[in-house]
């Protein structure tokens, strides 16, 4: 939101809807109504979704494509977690749906999440349409940032050409870590993980804990930091739908994860 508003644009939020099983889905009717009401010309798509961890199915993306194409909306597809779908799921790049979809899509990827290269600040912007590509290059030129750093380029190429073994091992580690956290959360009253299909992040619903402890959603981050000693991501930074949620990164050594879970369990027991 901050980046959009700094660029003097207006955010037209369309919250995801959580079903009875805790799975997040898009409200396409609400999306279309918002596009018609606001005249929005660009949609930011997170695929897989951060923070809720959905790996959108081809059918879901095709339905989204119908709406955006009908209204001439450009889709900026943030697919930085595309490599990190969990076993049983696979990321479908939005632009791969069809040539028509690719024509109004700007795809953003990077080796930073998959290969732990965020510090090198390198990413890939894929634009099939010539007009969109010219527009992007023109805007890029106005920033004065026209060339990525040499080390980042070298690392990016090495990761994509020679990083298969690393990525396979990472995916196994993340899947095991996620299952481990979900099992441990069964011992912690009032906190549960939303069903997750990808990324190395878990979206934790803490509403039960807050209710039991008599706390307000805005106090959650304070409890996590001061009582549990954990610096997690307050769900509110992701919008109103994040109230009562927090985000945790499971891509770390098992000992680190276990210590964090111990501190979380201890703090919840003490507060409630």
What are the roles of these predicted feature ranges?
Residues 1-272:
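PLP-dependent class I/II
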């Amino acid at each position: 939101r901050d980046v959009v508003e700094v660029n003097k644009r207006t955010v037209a939020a369309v919250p995801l809807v959580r079903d009875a099983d805790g799975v997040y889905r898009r409200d396409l009717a609400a999306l279309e109504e918002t596009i018609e009401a606001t005249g929005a010309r660009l949609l930011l798509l997170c695929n897989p979704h951060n923070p809720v961890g959905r790996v959108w199915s081809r059918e879901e993306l095709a339905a989204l494509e119908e709406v955006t194409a009908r209204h001439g909306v450009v889709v900026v597809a943030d697919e930085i977690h595309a490599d990190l779908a969990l076993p049983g799921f696979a990321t479908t790049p939005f632009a791969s749906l069809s040539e028509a979809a690719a024509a109004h899509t700007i795809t953003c990827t990077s080796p930073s999440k998959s290969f732990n290269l965020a510090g090198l600040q390198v990413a890939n912007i894929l634009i099939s349409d010539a007009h969109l590509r010219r527009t992007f290059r023109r805007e890029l030129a106005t920033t004065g940032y026209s060339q990525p750093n040499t080390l980042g380029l070298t690392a990016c190429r090495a990761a994509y050409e020679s990083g298969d073994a690393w990525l396979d091992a990472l995916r196994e580690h993340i899947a095991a870590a996620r299952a481990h956290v979900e099992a441990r959360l069964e011992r912690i009253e009032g906190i549960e993980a939303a069903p997750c299909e990808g990324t190395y992040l878990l979206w934790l619903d803490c509403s039960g804990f807050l209710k039991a402890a008599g706390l307000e959603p805005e106090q959650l981050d304070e409890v996590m930091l001061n009582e549990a000693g954990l610096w997690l991501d307050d769900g509110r930074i992701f919008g109103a739908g994040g109230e009562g949620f927090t985000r945790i990164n499971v891509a770390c050594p098992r000992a680190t994860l276990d210590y964090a879970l111990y501190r979380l369990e201890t703090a919840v027991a003490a507060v409630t």
